[in-house]
Amino acid sequence: MNILKLSIAGLSIFSFTLTAGQKVTVPASVQGIFEKYCTDCHGAKKKKGDLQLHDIANLEKDFQSNILNKIEEQLFIEEMPPKDEEQLSENELSILSEWIENQYKRMGENSKFQAKLKTPDFGNYVNHEDLFSGKYKDLKGFTPDRRWLINEFIFTEKINQVTNTRQQRNRDGKRVNIHNSSKRNLNITNPFLLPSGSGVRYYDNTMLNGGHLLSMISNAKELSKYLMNERQMSSMAPVYKVMKLELDHDKELEKRQRFLHENIHELMQEIYGEKNKDYLPEFISLNMEATPVSPDGNSYILPDGRKVKKSNHDVAAPKGEYPYIKTAIVKYYVKDQTSAELVRLCEKEWYEKGTGKLKISTRVGFMVNYMSEILRRNKFKPGQFKPKVFKEDDIKLYKEMILKHRQKGDFHNAVIKKSVDEWQAGFEAERKALGELKEPEIIEIINCLFQRILDREPNDGEIQEHLSLMQSYISTLGRREALTKFIETLVLRSEFVYRYEFGDGKADEHGRKMMSPEAAAYALAYAINDSAPDEELRKAVKNGKLNTREDYKREIERMLKRRDLYYLIDERVGQNADGLTNTPIRKLRFFREFFGYPNFPEIFKDNKRLGASYDRIKFRLLEECDQLVDYIISKDKNVFEELLTSDRYYVYHSGDNEQMKKASDDIKKQYEYFKDLDWQNFTYEDFMKHKDFIVESGISHMRGKGEVKWLQRSLGELMMRNKNGKTPDPFKSKLAQSRAKTRLDGISIAHFFNIKFDEWDYPVTQPAALPNRKGILSHPAWLMAFSQNTHTDPVLRGKWIREKLLAGTIPDVPITVEAVVPEDHHKTFRARLEDVTEVKYCWKCHKLMNPLGYAFEMFDDFGRYRTEEALEHPDNLLKKNPDKGTEYEDLRDIFKTQPVITNGHLKGTEDDKLDGDVKNALDLVERLAKSERVRQSIIRHAFRYFMGRNEVLSDSKTLIDADQAYLKSGGSFDAVIVSLLTSDSFIYRKAVKE
């Protein structure tokens, strides 16, 4: 471990107090090191890597800064000097380390390389052996004080909590509340979406930007509007109390306005009698006529003679205006009346009411062209309209207003507006007469809204600050607008979108402090699920029982054991309850992010090449991969090894073994019933003799003769699936249900696993063993996630193994490299990749990836096992198959093939018994699962996931303890979580300079 690496990685966050910007100086001691080790390749004559060090002091400041970063990075990752050259001594490294630090100070800059070390892509840069050797275990772990931006999942739960949104789903015959669903009747934008890709995605170094802010301004307005509706206010007693009278006034005003709109025509007739017509505005008709139609009635004839198709009644009907048309026709329809007369009476009423010209035009236009159809469909009758009879007491108020405000020529809407305005003014005066809100009332409101929006009580200073603010809002805006504004203010506070994790109280001898119990409660809750602390955790805070490491452990273990909460795993999957889990969601999500398999649905795949409908079944495949991971982590034994090597999978299975057995048995009964009948030649009448069984067993509803061919095809599939006495898959059985009790679709996922339906002995108990597969890395979901649209990708697969399992690093692709594999339809993809990557310039990096990825060539880009690769090119086509068929048919075209070569090489476990040539992917994953380095690499990623940052040398003891917890517990991932969340790295916070 070099001194430069210790100076950066041994301190949690390395930064400087900046001074005025000056240029770099190079003392003789540093120049001597450059001349001894560097300038032969990076001097005046040579410029390898576009880097020269002989004249750095005379360069522009920007160039100097870039060179400093390059030097620092190369020394840290020990790439320079090259491994086969003389290496720097500890003293020389110390000189360079001190020089680099001093130069950053002179320039008034922080190291860009150190900033990179905090990002997810650079987590592996800290030397693995240094972390786990015990050499640095005495360094005291902590996490810097931090203000941590929330992620998309926490945001969703926050909004659901603020809005009292509770989603429910069916799960095994009962309704359960679910978390993590953003389905709500509210126009909220989630601005905190995490990046895609495999690996830990949520780090504490994401900064609030303009996009976040703009979205939150819009969200604040939407939330304030939503919380100020009566239903939401009723759940906030102090708010509801001060708004009750205004809400009552609003309802009364709405009632009166609605009554006038519905009845003003009749009221005016009753008030004015024969004189009513003298007050009406002069009627100006639109005089619309029906558009001429062709003799066959199917087309309109336009003025220029062109014909356009006439829409049918249902298409042409103006949906928003149709109710007004029907209401008016009921009122004016009489026997022997012409359509023109009826239209005119309706139009006149709308005109007098003050209905807009566009609306009248829409209504009249539809009536003149479709009157006969309107009358026929609605079966209007003369005398159907019964004038309303009003009680004098009920209409006294309205009559007074009409008499007071109506002027000759007024449209009805004008009279209504004048009346409503007067009532509105009266209500406002009534409320104003009650006086201003008292201070205690406002304080109650402040407390209530703080609790609702920020999930805490305000302190005394905040109460006084917001009391003045609320009083100002109320005096200038009124109660409703003041409350709306105050809600927006709280939503836009930084604590709504940030997690605050700062040390509190007295520091220990190392300058570290524990978090406050309140902050710790949120840190623990967000580590295990995405919600605010549950009631038990809040009680622990209130009762002073979240102050010690043992307190943390007790609460963590309790939360990990909870199974009464259900979480939506992935909103893309749809509404099936199979997409739910009652495993604490962040426990499952770690492995989803670590393996990266949920990314595969974003990769386009061709249906024809799969031989089935890819888009219809891809999310079923994702669900079943989630089921497998959930199953393994719920067992919580040898979790890493099982995830890497288990040969058991779910294939077309809900996870309910008992229910799936019943479904398969149902198929067997259908087979037994029909196997000896001449169903191939049945007529509809023949099938009707067996109607009771057909309907009861779910084969068909028997709704007509058109089902004969469908029945025969279904029975043909039934016979095929019951061949040779094997257990049939339960597809199309009414008992083949998801956990939501809906039909279980997606039988075609069997194509991914090389299953032939006429040979499939369906395992009703799953997960079940499958040949030629071991673990998640041979699950089609993972294999497709690390593939391209039309071919495999050994580079991506090898890179993932190198970085995620072997704690290795891969340099970035140089910008001068065009990473394209040449086309050659006579060669396998591996052969083409070897041609382009195994040249000297490329092999330096590709040797770290390709030999690992080559082992997975035993699977194609859909994750199907293979021994030969189809050379998919028109010149190699042997047989063209149909583009469409049943779920059971393999529709792939047949091409010439070449044998696939699956041998590879494992290097990087640092174990001679494991490193070496491998036969294929199964051999590779077996070796990986036995590797100490692989186990520790997964734990490093778990550290990043639960801490929200990269590990540094002061976290060495935390990582060693987590590794030992896994081993001593028999491979429990819960034990790893408990160890991490009770470590010094999690418990302690410390202020560091930024």
Tell me what each language-model feature is.
Residues K438, I442, E457, G461, ...:
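Extended, well-ordered alpha-helical scaffold/bundle regions in very large, multi-domain proteins
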Residues A20-E98, Q766-A921, V925-A929, R935, ...:
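Sequence context surrounding c-type heme c attachment/ligation sites in exported
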Residues C448-L454, F486-V497, I585-F600, F946-N950:
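Core structural elements
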Residues G435-K438, I446, T476, R480-G503, ...:
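Aromatic-lined, polymer-binding surfaces characteristic
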Residues A20-G354, S361-G365, N369-Q384, K388, ...:
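Aromatic- and Gly/Pro-enriched helix-to-coil junctions and flexible linker segments
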Residues K5-S15:
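Bacterial N-terminal signal peptides
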Residues S181-S285, D314-T327, K331-K391, I395-K399, ...:
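A cross-family structural signal marking well-folded subdomains
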